[in-house]
UniProtKB/Swiss-Prot annotation:
InterPro entries in the record: CinA, CinA_Arc, MoaB/Mog-like_dom_sf, MoaB/Mog_dom
Top-rank taxon: Archaea
SUPFAM superfamilies per record: Molybdenum cofactor biosynthesis proteins (SSF53218)
Name listed for the protein in its UniProt record: Protein Saci_1508
Family annotation (Gene3D superfamilies): MoaB/Mog-like domain
UniProt similarity note: Belongs to the CinA family.
SMART domains: MoCF_biosynth
Length: 264
């Protein structure tokens, strides 16, 4: 089965300082995982053109199928993603006609002038295409580079989510012929260290991703969320295998004195 690797880049000093929790990376990862991609790396860098350029270059050199960035597409001085991406690709940084028209229309509807800061959101790497942003002003940026699809999204979560969906619907050219499926349940009264050797054996048996997520302290009324996930070109087959593994884990948990609870 061909590897459909993806990388996620988050850009912003506010994330590195701990002021903002990086929920965008989590959303993007879950969404593209549902399409069949495997996220190999999530990287966060500061609002610096050289840093942004370097992280894009490094990602491109690893040759994933897809790179998605979030943050740094607004009108302020520290929104530098677009320029950093242009530098990484070795292309000019220029006003994109289609993006410019999108921005003109949005400000015109509001009766607002087109300032230098607002025009800045129309500047993109040469050869890029704007991705519609129905929740804000700055469009996303899509570019195909050496068979790698690259998307840059704004950092505001609702804008990122909207741009990501518009990208998937209207721009994404290649996607895996792979189905992803996961299921999970709660196991109460069994410590993670107790079930760990059984999990290790089932990973070998089923060739699936099995993860126990503690929801409480190990020694004090242990509670685990047990997650099982896998990918395959056959949707029905991977669903069957994951659920078979889930059932075996439930039986093991019960034998170990635990209580199974479904997640609603």
């Amino acid at each position: 089965m061909e590897n459909w690797y993806a990388e996620i880049i988050t850009i912003g000093n506010e994330i590195l300082s701990g002021k903002t929790i990086n929920t965008n990376a989590s959303h993007i990862a879950r969404r593209i995982l549902s399409l069949g991609y495997v996220v190999r790396r999530i990287t966060t860098v500061m609002d610096d053109i050289e840093e942004i350029s370097l992280v894009f270059k490094e990602a491109i050199n690893r040759k994933p199928k897809l790179i998605i960035s979030t943050g740094g597409l607004g009108p302020t001085y520290d929104d530098k993603t677009s320029e950093g991406l242009a530098l990484a690709l070795g292309v000019s940084f220029e006003i994109n006609k289609d993006a410019y028209e999108m921005i003109v229309e949005k400000y015109k509807k509001r009766g607002l002038p087109l300032t230098e800061e607002r025009v800045k959101m129309a500047k993109m790497p040469a050869g890029a295409a704007p991705v519609r942003n129905d929740e804000g002003i700055a469009p996303g940026i899509y570019i195909l580079h050496k068979d790698i699809e690259i998307l840059a999204t704004p950092g505001v979560p609702r804008e990122m989510e909207n741009v990501l969906e518009n990208f998937i619907k209207y721009h994404l050219k290649n996607r895996p012929n792979i189905s992803y499926y996961e299921n999970s349940f709660l196991l109460l009264g069994v410590m993670e260290s107790t079930i760990a050797p059984y999990v290790k054996e089932l990973v070998k048996k089923y060739n699936l991703y099995i993860k126990t997520h503690p929801r409480s302290k190990e020694m004090d009324k242990p509670e685990l969320e047990v997650q099982v996930a896998g990918s395959s070109t056959d949707k029905e087959e991977i669903t069957r295998i994951v659920n078979e593994c889930i059932n075996e884990l439930k039986q093991i948990g019960t034998r170990l004195g635990g209580r199974v609870q479904e997640i609603m």
